A protein has these predicted regions:
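Contiguous, non-catalytic segments that form substrate-binding/exosite surfaces or channel walls
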Residues: 1-58
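Alpha-helix capping and helix-loop boundary segments enriched in small/acidic/polar residues
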Residues: 8, 48-49, 65-77, 99-108, ...
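Generic, well-ordered alpha-helical scaffold segments in large soluble proteins
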Residues: 16-24, 81, 85, 89, ...
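Active-site-adjacent bridging/hinge elements
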Residues: 49-60, 82-93, 128-130, 187
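Glycine-rich, often proline-containing surface loops adjacent to acidic residues and nearby aromatics
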Residues: 56-65, 155-156
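Active-site recognition of the HExxH zinc-binding catalytic motif
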Residues: 63-92, 113-114
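Post-HExxH zinc-binding segment in Zn-dependent metallohydrolases
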Residues: 90-143
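Long, amphipathic alpha-helical stalk/connector segments used for oligomerization, subunit docking
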Residues: 122-187
Length: 187
């Protein structure tokens, strides 16, 4: 696999980070600056991003690399975590008041990480030529939202039912949950 050849070690991924940032639009100087503040460490699990807590420390990108190198799954996760580290680094070093470190918030850092992850193939020089790519991405986004919303909608309906039926038995609750789930999911 291409990723295994490119990234046989955590150090190889770390060395390529400025190049990845340039491909994502950062100037060479800015890319080198940001990447110099991120250290890549091996992980037993899938990966994790831990931001530095004070200037002078490095953010840590933990990623799994096997003895055969980084497989695509590990690469995809590492690119996502790299997005977190970039946000954490900018967030720490480019603010004028330390107490604002960590702001905006988790939703913002996740959005940036997913932007990085979405471009993982571009970073490898692999172009997706599927003419349906945008349409499929839209369907994926709609389904992902519906999966989250569907669970929430069901929770709300079950709680409304529970308040309306405070003396319900477990069997009645089960029956109501199944009926409500069908109503929510079969819209």
């Amino acid at each position: 696999a291409k990723t295994q050849k490119l990234y046989p070690t955590p150090a190889a991924f770390e060395k390529d980070m400025p190049n990845m940032l340039r491909k994502l639009g950062w100037s060479p100087e800015r890319a080198s600056y940001i990447a110099s503040k991120i250290q890549v460490d091996p992980a037993r699990g899938s990966g994790h991003a831990a931001g530095a807590q004070m200037k002078g420390d490095k953010a840590r990108l933990r990623t799994r690399i096997t003895d055969k190198g980084m497989n695509y799954k590990g690469y995809n996760i590492a690119v996502h975590e790299f997005g977190h580290n970039v946000e954490q680094t900018i967030d720490l070093y480019d603010i004028d008041y330390y107490m604002l470190q960590g702001v905006p918030n988790t939703a913002f850092t996740e959005a940036l990480a997913f932007l990085f992850q979405k471009r993982d193939l571009d970073l490898l020089g692999i172009k997706e030529n599927n003419p349906d790519k945008e349409h499929l991405a839209s369907l994926d986004a709609i389904w992902s939202c519906y999966e989250i919303m569907g669970v929430s909608l069901l929770d709300m309906q079950v709680w409304k039912w529970l308040y309306a039926n405070p003396d319900a038995t477990p069997a009645q609750l089960k029956e109501a949950v199944i009926r409500l789930a069908k109503e929510v999911w079969n819209l």
